[in-house]
UniProtKB/Swiss-Prot annotation:
Its main location: cytoplasm. Belongs to the glycosyl hydrolase 32 family. It is found in: Cytoplasm. This is Sucrose-6-phosphate hydrolase. Its EC number is 3.2.1.26. GO terms for biological process: sucrose metabolic process. It comes from Zymomonas mobilis subsp. mobilis (strain ATCC 31821 / ZM4 / CP4). The keyword Cytoplasm applies. It is an enzyme of class 3 (hydrolase). The gene is sacA.
Length: 512
């Protein structure tokens, strides 16, 4: 007898296949970011290099461009750039995941691709807390078709815990370890977030070890984050990293400007003890970056991908039948107790026509240019020592009628500013990152049809900060300009590349 989830899987796959090539007409459909063929996408899940290919799973609702009972979408790649959409991996409907296959991870268990995910059950529609969440397993030999194995971890660390989700598993000294987020409630707060640590010998029988870290007064988070979602725990350089997505932090100055955050704490790990040594630091300074997940590339690089969106932000692409995409894959490094992120070198595969201007000097002036395509990579070096302008930078995706996305250095604030108040349909707001204390600032920019990603560096280090935001300009907004306001600005180098549309391949996949 076919299980309810198998029937739902067939329906989901049928919805994905019916999408066909209709998204090619969407003016905002990305050219080089992983994006659903139809419906809704959020958290990346199960990133792994398995049998010679990179696999990316993701939270997916294929029936409409809104959040619904979560499935696991699936894509694979050989180069981290060209992704092939595969059949839907998981669908909800069984007793243990009736209302959603929530986020989780993937591990290679002796040649068996094994997914560990959260089964979500709604107990009542009267409250968001009337839920039950358990950790489940599914396995695959071919890496495409999965067999559910049911619940492997049922009990949360404490009684009466409803929110208990997003397992991340790794192997260390012949033991499997798992971190998973959970929430305890008290009378004064909406909730308090924690990360629990478990251990197993076989991936099926898990023992609670301890609460790895909780939202307490010893951390600058205080008791303000009511849930810690999507935890990850890994080594980078000579430090251990606890990465997670806290919900409920209040904005403070330039920090915590989004509804929810994504960041990390550095510390020392002597199993089973994690000793934090830094405060919580955000990974990205843009409007749209959440639920990041990390994995190890075939050459040992630590690579991160995040959901390139944010809860409650406007999603104009819903009119075209899709919502959500992933950030570019980013290489992680640890420099001076800070994680730095740079786009993976494989992105250079997409470079086509190149335009180079060696030195551009402006004095209260503009330097216009035209983009051949909305798919652009830009490298700009700004000489701070030789410049006096109050503001200097770029206007991108302009149409000559007021539509533009502004990226500029503001000397009065010592910040790099992204202003998307005129960036197209239903988006607004300003985000910023610190201006590096350096003589020259390097801006590495990727423009897709509905996004901008900026990597900020100094003389020595690329990727000190990143700013990732969605924009929704008109398709003919292809003008740009360099500018300097109230003084002169020296741009030592200005390089631009038109990029190939890597996502066209997704529409010719046999799986879709």
């Amino acid at each position: 007898m076919e299980s309810p989830s198998y029937k739902n899987l067939i329906k989901a796959e049928d919805a994905q296949k019916k999408a066909g090539k209709r998204l090619l007409s969407s003016e905002w459909y990305p050219g080089f970011h992983v994006t659903p063929l139809t419906g809704w996408m959020n958290d990346p899940n199960g990133l792994i290099f398995f049998k010679g290919e990179y696999h990316l799973f993701y939270q997916y609702y294929p029936f409409a461009p809104v959040w619904g009972p979560m499935h696991w979408g699936h894509a694979k790649s050989r180069d981290l750039v060209h992704w092939e959409t595969l059949p839907v991996a998981l669908a909800p409907g069984d007793s243990f995941d009736r209302d959603g296959c929530f986020s989780g991870c993937a591990v290679d268990n002796n040649g068996v691709l094994t997914l560990i995910y959260t089964g979500h059950i709604v107990l009542s529609n009267d409250s968001l807390d009337a839920i039950r969440e358990v950790q489940c397993m599914a396995t695959s030999i071919d890496g495409i078709h999965f067999q559910k194995e049911g619940i492997v971890l049922e009990k949360a660390p404490m009684p009466q815990v409803a929110h208990f989700r997003d397992p991340r598993v790794w192997k260390e000294n012949n033991h499997w370890f798992m971190v998973v987020g959970y929430r305890t409630d008290d009378e004064k707060h909406q909730g308090i977030g924690h990360v629990a640590l478990y251990r197993s010998e076989n991936l099926k029988d898990w023992i609670f070890v301890k609460t790895l870290l909780g939202d307490n007064s010893q951390l600058p988070l205080g008791k303000r984050a009511f849930m810690w979602e999507c935890p990850d725990f890994f080594s980078l350089g000579n430090r251990s990293v606890l990465m997670f997505s806290p919900q409920g932090l209040k904005a403070s100055g330039y920090k915590n400007r989004n509804l929810f955050q994504n960041g990390y704490i550095l510390g020392k790990w002597q199993a089973p003890q994690f000793t934090p040594e830094t405060s919580f630091q955000e990974l990205d300074y843009g409007h749209d970056f959440y639920a990041a997940q990390r994995f190890e590339a075939k050459d040992g690089r630590q690579i991160l991908i995040a959901w390139f969106d944010m809860w409650e932000n406007q999603k104009p692409s819903q009119r075209d039948g899709w919502a959500g995409c992933m950030t570019l894959p980013r290489k992680l490094d640890l420099i001076d107790n800070k994680i730095v992120m740079t786009p993976v070198r494989e992105m250079e595969i997409l470079r086509q026509s190149e335009k180079i201007e060696s030195v551009v000097t402006l004095s209260d002036a503009e330097h216009p240019f035209t983009m051949d395509s909305p798919l652009q990579e830009i490298e700009l070096i700004f000489d701070l020592e030789k410049s006096s302008a109050y503001q200097a930078g770029l206007a991108l995706r302009c149409n000559g009628k007021g539509q533009e996305t502004l990226l500029y250095i503001d000397r009065s604030q010592n910040r790099i500013i992204l202003d998307r108040n005129r960036s197209g349909q239903n988006v607004k707001g300003i985000r910023s990152c610190p201006l590096p204390n350096t003589s020259k600032v390097r801006l590495h920019i990727f423009l897709d049809r509905s996004s901008i990603e900026i990597f900020v560096g100094d003389d020595q280090t690329q990727g000190l900060y990143s700013i990732s935001s969605r924009i929704f300009p008109d398709k003919d907004s292809l003008k740009g300009r360099l500018f300097a306001i109230e003084g002169y600005a020296v741009f030592d180098s200005f390089k631009r590349w038109t990029l190939q549309d890597a996502n066209l391949a997704a529409f010719s996949s046999d799986a879709c």
